[in-house]
C-alpha cells in the first residue's frame, strides 16, 4: 500500500507505484487502444514538414487558440471604475466562466452578474431579464455604476441594450440618473481585446456624450492632464501601479482610465472588498478635458482612441512597451506632451536597466525565441528581444490581424536580429507546435497553455502573458517601465540559466560545465 | 470552537431562520419571495430539506451556476479521452473550460487522446449570418486528417448554434456515413437551455443513449470475455485521479471494472457498458439518466455509492458486494480490513486537529451531501450546505441520509447570500468553488475548493481520504489565519477568534 498517514502521497506520486501502474495497464484492454507502434508513427508524423503543411492548410478548425471572447475584456475593463458592477446580458454560464478565468489568473475574487437568459428569453427577448436584473443588482450589491455588456446569445437574438436600459429605468429598476453605460460585445467578433475597447468606449461615451440622451453632452475645456489606458493586461496590477509611479515622479496631472490595479489585488485582513480603487466616475467624466489620451496597447483601444480624438484630444498609442527603447519612447512622449522634465530618478532607473542588460546580454544574445500572445504583448516582447540581441523567430497572435502583421514585420525589418523571423496572425497553438518541431527555437514565451508545447517539443517555456494559472503572483510585479524591463530580463535569464544547469548536471558525464559562476 | 456549535439545536434553528429572514431583506419584494423558497433550515425526520430547486436563477443576483454546455462538454463528454470534442460556436466557452476540470487520463495527448486540447469552430460573424453547418463539415474533415487516431467526435453546441437554425444532426449523419460509420455525436447543449449545468448532463446522457447505444449492433461483442463480476463506474470524472483510487478498491474486492464514465474513459468503454452486471453510480445527479436507461433497456441494475471517507466507503463496499456472491462479500470485508490501519492512522493524526471544527459547503452534483461523512470521520461538523444545480431527489437523499437537524440549506445560493451566511455563522472552513475561494479567504475564513480539490486529490477511496484529511488540516490550521490583522490595529473581533 503506497499511502500512509505519515507521508501522504497525492496525485503527483500516488499513481506511480506498482499497484496503480498494474491497475492502469489492465484497464487498457477495455479501452480498445490503438497499436502503440501506430501511435508512435503518428506522433513522429506530426513533427514533420508534411504535417505542418496540412496543419497550416486548415481553414475551419481552431486547435488551442490563444484568445478569449469579447465579454471577458469588457468585464476586465468595467471593474476598473469606482464601485462598478459588470452586468453581462445573456446566458449565465458565460459569467461563471469569466469570473473563474479571472480568479484563476489573479488569485483574487472576480465579481460580475448575469441577466440569466434562458429559452423563453431566446424567443421573447431579454428585456425582463434586464429589468429584473438591474433592480436586483442595484439593491444587493450597491454599485455606483453598472456596466452592461453582452454574450453572443443576446447578440444573436438582437437585444437592444440602449432601449432595454431606458425601459428598465422607466420601470424603476435603477434611478433615472444612475449610471448604466453599455457596450455590445459579440463573442463572434474579435477577441477579449476588442471587448475591452468596446466597453471602455461605451463608458467614456456615456459620461462624455450625454449619458444616452439623458444629460447634456459635456463641453470639453482642455487642461494639461493626460489620460492613460492600460488595455487588457494580465500584469495590470503591477503595470498600472508602475505607470502611476512614473507619472507622479514626473509631476504629470493624469487619470488612469479603467484602473483595476486595486480590485485585483486586495489585502486579506478579514474584509472582502467587492469593489476597491478604480477610476472615479468624476474622473472618468473629467477625462474629456485632458490634453491627450495615451494607450499602452494600440490593438486594445482602437475605437476608444478614435473616440478621444474626435473630442479634440491628442492621442498616442504604444504596443505594450517593454524594455529600454520602448520605455524611452514612452517617457519622452510623456515629457513632450506634458511639457514636464524627465526627473533624474528615471534616468538612474534607465541606467540600471542598461547596466543589467550589459551584465547579462551575452547569455541572451543570439538565442532564438518563439512568442505568442495578444498582438500588443507580442510586439512589445519582440522589440525587447531585439534590443537584447536575441532573435525572435516565430511571432504568433491568434487575435492579431493584417495591420498587426505589417507593423510586426516593419519592426523586425528594422533590426539585424529580426531578419529570420516570421509573423503569424490568426494562427493557433497547434500551428505553433508545428513551427517548433520544424523550425526549433531555444525558448518559447507565452501563457500557461505554452506548457503543453514545452512538453511536446521540449522548448523551455518562459511564462509571460495571460492567463498564467500555474505560477503565482507574477501579475503583482510590473513588466512596464525600466524596472519592469528588469523584471522581464530576470525572468528570461532565470530560464536560460536553469536550462544550462539542467543540461550539465549529470554526475561524471556533463557536470564539468556545471559552473558555480555564470 | 466556533460560534455555531455553542448553542442547542433549537437555538441554532432559530438563529438560522432569523439569518434567512435577514438576508431576504436585501431583495426587491418579488425577488425575496422567489429566493425564500430556496433557503431553509433542515428539520430532522423530514423527507427533504424543505427547499425548491432546479428552478431558473434570478437575473442580476450573481448566481454561481453555469450552463448546459458546461454540463455536457465540461462534465460528461469532455473526459472521454479518445474522442475529439468540438466546442461549436464562438471561441470563449472552449477557452474558459480548457483543461480546468482536472479530468486525469493516460494517453498520448494530441495523438490518441484529446482531453486537454481546445477544439473550436471559433464562430465569426459570417458563420452567424450564413450558418455554421458548412464550417462544421470542413472541421470534421480537418480533424480526420490531422488527428487520424481519434476514435470519435462530439459536437458540443454553444448558444448561437440553436438560435441560427443549424442542423448539426444532419451534418453528423452525413459525415459519419462518409467516414464508414464513424461515431460522430451532435449534442444540443446550448448554454441557454435549462436553468443550470444540470440540463446539460441530461442532454449529454441522452446523446450517449441515442448516438452511442443507438448505433451499437445488438450482436456487438466486447473485445474481452465477460465475467460475472463485471461492473462499470458511472459518474466519476477522475478529478485528480478519483476514479483510479476508487477502481483499485473494486478490483481488490474481486470485481472487474469494464468501463469508467467518464473520467479516463474511452468510447470502447461506453460501448461495452451494456455488458456490465452492475452499474455503480457515484454522481447521481449527472448520470442517473443513463443508469436508468441501461436498467430499462439492458436490465442492468444500478446502485449508488459514496467513496468519501472510511465510514461511507465501508458502507458502499458492502452495498456493492450485496449484488454479488460470497466471494465478493468476503472481498469487501478483506478490503475494509486491509485499509483499517491506514484509516486509523489518518484519523489518529488529523482528528485531534480538526475535532469540532465547523464546515459550510456549496458545491455541485453529489458533493454537498457525499463529503459530509468524510468530514464527520474527522470529527468535523457540517453546519450548512446547498446545491448549485441539485433537484429535489438530491435534497431528499441529503435529508434522509446526511445532514443533521437544523443545518442551514441554501439552493442556488448567490454571492450576497453566501457571504452573509458565512459572515454570521463563521465556520472554520468553507468548501466551494474558485469563484468563492478568494472572497472567503479575504474574510480570513479558511477555504478549500471542492470542485477541483484545489489542485490536489484524489479524494475518493481510502488513499484519497488521507489526502482529504491532510488538505482540510492544512487549510483550517494554516498559521496565516492568525496573522491577518495588523498587530497595531484593533483587537481581533469575535469573528476572527471564531476563524481561529
Swiss-Prot record, chain A:
It catalyses: N2 + 8 reduced [2Fe-2S]-[ferredoxin] + 16 ATP + 16 H2O = H2 + 8 oxidized [2Fe-2S]-[ferredoxin] + 2 NH4(+) + 16 ADP + 16 phosphate + 6 H(+). Binds 1 [8Fe-7S] cluster per heterodimer. Disulfide bonds: none annotated. Coiled coil: none annotated. Pfam families: DUF3364, Oxidored_nitro. Its EC number is 1.18.6.1. Its cofactor is [8Fe-7S] cluster. InterPro entries: ChlB/BchB/BchZ, Nase/OxRdtase_comp1, Nase_comp1_CS, Nase_Mo-Fe_CF_bsu, Nase_Mo-Fe_CF_bsu_N. One of its GO terms (molecular function) is metal ion binding. It comes from the Bacteria. One of its GO terms (cellular component) is molybdenum-iron nitrogenase complex. [8Fe-7S] cluster binds at residues 69, 94, 152. One of its GO terms (biological process) is nitrogen fixation. It is an enzyme of class 1 (oxidoreductase). Keywords: ATP-binding, Iron, Iron-sulfur, Metal-binding, Nitrogen fixation, Nucleotide-binding, Oxidoreductase. PROSITE patterns: NITROGENASE_1_1, NITROGENASE_1_2. Ala-187 is present instead of the usual Ser that would serve as a ligand for the 8Fe-7S cluster in the oxidized state. This molybdenum-iron protein is part of the nitrogenase complex that catalyzes the key enzymatic reactions in nitrogen fixation. Belongs to the NifD/NifK/NifE/NifN family. Tetramer of two alpha and two beta chains. Forms complex with the iron protein (nitrogenase component 2). PANTHER family: LIGHT-INDEPENDENT PROTOCHLOROPHYLLIDE REDUCTASE SUBUNIT B. This is Nitrogenase molybdenum-iron protein beta chain. It comes from Bradyrhizobium diazoefficiens (strain JCM 10833 / BCRC 13528 / IAM 13628 / NBRC 14792 / USDA 110). The gene is nifK.
Amino acid at each position: 500500500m503506497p499511502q500512509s498517514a505519515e507521508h501522504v502521497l497525492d496525485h503527483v506520486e500516488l499513481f506511480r507505484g506498482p499497484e496503480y501502474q498494474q491497475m492502469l495497464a489492465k484497464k487498457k484492454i477495455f479501452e480498445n487502444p490503438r497499436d502503440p507502434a501506430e501511435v508512435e508513427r503518428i506522433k513522429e508524423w506530426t513533427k514533420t514538414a508534411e504535417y505542418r503543411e496540412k496543419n497550416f492548410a486548415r481553414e475551419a478548425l481552431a486547435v488551442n487558440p490563444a484568445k478569449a471572447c469579447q465579454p471577458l475584456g469588457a468585464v476586465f475593463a468595467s471593474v476598473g471604475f469606482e464601485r462598478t458592477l459588470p452586468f453581462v446580458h445573456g446566458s449565465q454560464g458565460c459569467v461563471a466562466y469569466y469570473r473563474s478565468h479571472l480568479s484563476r489568473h489573479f488569485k483574487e475574487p472576480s465579481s460580475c452578474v448575469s441577466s440569466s437568459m434562458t429559452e423563453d428569453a431566446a424567443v421573447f427577448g431579454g428585456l425582463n431579464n434586464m429589468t429584473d436584473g438591474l433592480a436586483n443588482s442595484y439593491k444587493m450589491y450597491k454599485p455606483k455604476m453598472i456596466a452592461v455588456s453582452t454574450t453572443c446569445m443576446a447578440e444573436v437574438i438582437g437585444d437592444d441594450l440602449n432601449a432595454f436600459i431606458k425601459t428598465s429605468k422607466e420601470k424603476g429598476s435603477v434611478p433615472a440618473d444612475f449610471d448604466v453605460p453599455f457596450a455590445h460585445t459579440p463573442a463572434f467578433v474579435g477577441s477579449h481585446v476588442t471587448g475591452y475597447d468596446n466597453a471602455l468606449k461605451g463608458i467614456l461615451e456615456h459620461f462624455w456624450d450625454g449619458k444616452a440622451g439623458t444629460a447634456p453632452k459635456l463641453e470639453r475645456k482642455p487642461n494639461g492632464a493626460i489620460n492613460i489606458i492600460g488595455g487588457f493586461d494580465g500584469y495590470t496590477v503591477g503595470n498600472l501601479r508602475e505607470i502611476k509611479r512614473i507619472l507622479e515622479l514626473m509631476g504629470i496631472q493624469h487619470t488612469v482610465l479603467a484602473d483595476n490595479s486595486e480590485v485585483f489585488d486586495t489585502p486579506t485582513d478579514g474584509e472582502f472588498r467587492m469593489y476597491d480603487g478604480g477610476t472615479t466616475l468624476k474622473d472618468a467624466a473629467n477625462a474629456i478635458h485632458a490634453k491627450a489620451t495615451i494607450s499602452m496597447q494600440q490593438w486594445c483601444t482602437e475605437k476608444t482612441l478614435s473616440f478621444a480624438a474626435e473630442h479634440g484630444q491628442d492621442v498616442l498609442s504604444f504596443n505594450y512597451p517593454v524594455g529600454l527603447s520602448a520605455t524611452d519612447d514612452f517617457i519622452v512622449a510623456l515629457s513632450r506632451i506634458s511639457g514636464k522634465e524627465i526627473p533624474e530618478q528615471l534616468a538612474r532607473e534607465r541606467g540600471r536597466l542598461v547596466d543589467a542588460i550589459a551584465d547579462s546580454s551575452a547569455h541572451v544574445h543570439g538565442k532564438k525565441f518563439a512568442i505568442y500572445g495578444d498582438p500588443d504583448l507580442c510586439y512589445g516582447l519582440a522589440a525587447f528581444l531585439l534590443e537584447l540581441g536575441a532573435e525572435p523567430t516565430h511571432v504568433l497572435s491568434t487575435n492579431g490581424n493584417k495591420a498587426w502583421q505589417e507593423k510586426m514585420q516593419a519592426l523586425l525589418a528594422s533590426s539585424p536580429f529580426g531578419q529570420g523571423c516570421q509573423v503569424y496572425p490568426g494562427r493557433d497553438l497547434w500551428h505553433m507546435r508545428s513551427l517548433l518541431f520544424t523550425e526549433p527555437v531555444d525558448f518559447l514565451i507565452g501563457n500557461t497553455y505554452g506548457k503543453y508545447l514545452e512538453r511536446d517539443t521540449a522548448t523551455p517555456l518562459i511564462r509571460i502573458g495571460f492567463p498564467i494559472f500555474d505560477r503565482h503572483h507574477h501579475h503583482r510585479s510590473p513588466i512596464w517601465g525600466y524596472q519592469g524591463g528588469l523584471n522581464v530580463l530576470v525572468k528570461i535569464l532565470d530560464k536560460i540559466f536553469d536550462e544550462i544547469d539542467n543540461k550539465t548536471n549529470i554526475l561524471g558525464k556533463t557536470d564539468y560545465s556545471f559552473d558555480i559562476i555564470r | 470552537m466556533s460560534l455555531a456549535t455553542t448553542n442547542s439545536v433549537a437555538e441554532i434553528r432559530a438563529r438560522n431562520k432569523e439569518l434567512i429572514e435577514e438576508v431576504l431583506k436585501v431583495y426587491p419584494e418579488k425577488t425575496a419571495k422567489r429566493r425564500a423558497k430556496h433557503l431553509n433550515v433542515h428539520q430532522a425526520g423530514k423527507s427533504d430539506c424543505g427547499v425548491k430547486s432546479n428552478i431558473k436563477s434570478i437575473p442580476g443576483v450573481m448566481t454561481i451556476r453555469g450552463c448546459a454546455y458546461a454540463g455536457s462538454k465540461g462534465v460528461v463528454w469532455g473526459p472521454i479521452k479518445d474522442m475529439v470534442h468540438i466546442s461549436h460556436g464562438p471561441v470563449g466557452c472552449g477557452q474558459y473550460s480548457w483543461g480546468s476540470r482536472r479530468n486525469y487520463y493516460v494517453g498520448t495527448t494530441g495523438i490518441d487522446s484529446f482531453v486537454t486540447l481546445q477544439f473550436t469552430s471559433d464562430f465569426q460573424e459570417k458563420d452567424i449570418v450564413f450558418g455554421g453547418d458548412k464550417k462544421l463539415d470542413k472541421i470534421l474533415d480537418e480533424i480526420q486528417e490531422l488527428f487520424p487516431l481519434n476514435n470519435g467526435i462530439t459536437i458540443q453546441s454553444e448558444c448561437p448554434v440553436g438560435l441560427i437554425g443549424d442542423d448539426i444532426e444532419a451534418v453528423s449523419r452525413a459525415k459519419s456515413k462518409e467516414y464508414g460509420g464513424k461515431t460522430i455525436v451532435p449534442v444540443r447543449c446550448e448554454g441557454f437551455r435549462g436553468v443550470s449545468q444540470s440540463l446539460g448532463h441530461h442532454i449529454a446522457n441522452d446523446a450517449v443513449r441515442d448516438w452511442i447505444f443507438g448505433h451499437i449492433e445488438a450482436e456487438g461483442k466486447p473485445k474481452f470475455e465477460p465475467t460475472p463480476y463485471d461492473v462499470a463506474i458511472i459518474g466519476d470524472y477522475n478529478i485528480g485521479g478519483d476514479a483510479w483510487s476508487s477502481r483499485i478498491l473494486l478490483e481488490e474486492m474481486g470485481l472487474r471494472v469494464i468501463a469508467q464514465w467518464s473520467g479516463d474513459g474511452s468510447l470502447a468503454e461506453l460501448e461495452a457498458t451494456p455488458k456490465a452486471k452492475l452499474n455503480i453510480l457515484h454522481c447521481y445527479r449527472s448520470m442517473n439518466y443513463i443508469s436508468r436507461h441501461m436498467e430499462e433497456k439492458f436490465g442492468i441494475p444500478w446502485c449508488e455509492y459514496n467513496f468519501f471517507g472510511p465510514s461511507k466507503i465501508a458502507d458502499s463496499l458492502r452495498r456493492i458486494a450485496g449484488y454479488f456472491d460470497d466471494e465478493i462479500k468476503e472481498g469487501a470485508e478483506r478490503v475494509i480490513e486491509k485499509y483499517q490501519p491506514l484509516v486509523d492512522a489518518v484519523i489518529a493524526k488529523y482528528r485531534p486537529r480538526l475535532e469540532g471544527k465547523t464546515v459550510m459547503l456549496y458545491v455541485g452534483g453529489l458533493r454537498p451531501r457525499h463529503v459530509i461523512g468524510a468530514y464527520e470521520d474527522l470529527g468535523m461538523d457540517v453546519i450548512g450546505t446547498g446545491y448549485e444545480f441539485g433537484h429535489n431527489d438530491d435534497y431528499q437523499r441529503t435529508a434522509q441520509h446526511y445532514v443533521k437537524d437544523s443545518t442551514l440549506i441554501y439552493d442556488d445560493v448567490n454571492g450576497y447570500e453566501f457571504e452573509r451566511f458565512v459572515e454570521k455563522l463563521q465556520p472554520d472552513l468553507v468548501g466551494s468553488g474558485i469563484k468563492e475561494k478568494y472572497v472567503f479567504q479575504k474574510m480570513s475564513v479558511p477555504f478549500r475548493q471542492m470542485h477541483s480539490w484545489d489542485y490536489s486529490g484524489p479524494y475518493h477511496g481510502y488513499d484519497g481520504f488521507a489526502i482529504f484529511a491532510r488538505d482540510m488540516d492544512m487549510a483550517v490550521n494554516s498559521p496565516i489565519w492568525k496573522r491577518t490583522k495588523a498587530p497595531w490595529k484593533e483587537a481581533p473581533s469575535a469573528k476572527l477568534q471564531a476563524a481561529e
